[in-house]
């Protein structure tokens, strides 16, 4: 809704990383190893990707970050780079709901169609509705990996709520 209303792109570091992984780029291969282990990709890599992305023409009227920044270093780097934000939104969801939602997700790799074993199941269990091909659970959607990522979130990302609430002056969200 927001991207359509303001005619701005949604920028997801996760999507950018998945594209790099699918393309088999050196960054993608490095990122895949880290993500599959439940870790977060290094800040310098993410910040570089984001700076390149927001410099593109379709971002001249603004953009919507999805899942970024994730660390204090990323937030500080964006402030230092002069990237000012109009608003910051935290969606507070209990860990148990996140684990349930993510670990239940199934994907048809060729098309990107996404299902959920409980909330949006395919017509035939484990099969894509259109092609009948197998659905997979991405490694980063496995329960153990999701729990590791949540632990990292609580350690590294929760501090951003305090960071943005205390940010003052021209860089503060309006």
Swiss-Prot record:
Which enzyme class? Answer: transferase
The catalytic activity of this protein is classed by the Enzyme Commission as 2.7.4.3
The record's InterPro entries line, in alphabetical order, gives:
Adenyl_kin_sub, Adenylat/UMP-CMP_kin, Adenylat_kinase_CS, Adenylate_kinase_lid-dom, P-loop_NTPase
Which keywords label this protein? Answer: ATP-binding, Cytoplasm, Kinase, Nucleotide biosynthesis, Nucleotide-binding, Transferase
**Entry GO terms, CC:** cytoplasm
- Return the annotated region ranges for LID: 104-141
* Location in the cell: Cytoplasm
Q: Which residues bind AMP?
A: 13, 18, 39-41, 67-70, 74, 138, 149
Q: Which Pfam families match?
A: ADK, ADK_lid
GO molecular function, a single term: ATP binding
User: Main site of residence?
Assistant: cytoplasm
Q: Where is this region: NMP?
A: 12-41
Identify the CDD domains for this entry. Answer: ADK (cd01428)
Q: Which reaction does it catalyse?
A: AMP + ATP = 2 ADP
Q: How does it assemble?
A: Monomer.
Q: Which family does it belong to?
A: Belongs to the adenylate kinase family.
Q: What does this protein do?
A: Catalyzes the reversible transfer of the terminal phosphate group between ATP and AMP. Plays an important role in cellular energy homeostasis and in adenine nucleotide metabolism.
Report what the protein is called: Adenylate kinase
Biological source species: Neisseria cinerea
Provide the gene name from the record: adk
């Amino acid at each position: 809704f927001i991207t359509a209303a303001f005619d701005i792109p949604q920028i997801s570091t996760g999507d950018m990383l998945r594209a790099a992984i699918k393309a088999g780029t050196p960054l993608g291969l490095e990122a895949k190893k880290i993500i599959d282990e439940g870790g977060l990709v290094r800040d310098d890599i993410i910040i570089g990707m984001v700076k390149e992305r927001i410099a593109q023409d379709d971002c001249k009227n603004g953009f919507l970050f999805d899942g970024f920044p994730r660390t204090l270093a990323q937030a500080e780097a964006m402030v230092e780079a002069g990237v000012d934000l109009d608003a910051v939104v935290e969606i507070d969801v209990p860990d148990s709901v996140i684990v349930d939602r993510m670990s239940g997700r199934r994907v048809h790799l060729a098309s990107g169609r996404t299902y959920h074993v409980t909330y949006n199941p395919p017509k035939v269990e484990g099969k894509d509705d259109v092609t009948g091909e197998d659905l997979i659970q991405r490694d980063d959607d496995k329960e153990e990996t999701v729990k590791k990522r949540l632990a990292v979130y609580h350690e590294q990302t929760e501090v951003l709520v305090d960071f943005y609430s205390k940010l003052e002056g021209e860089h503060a969200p309006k």
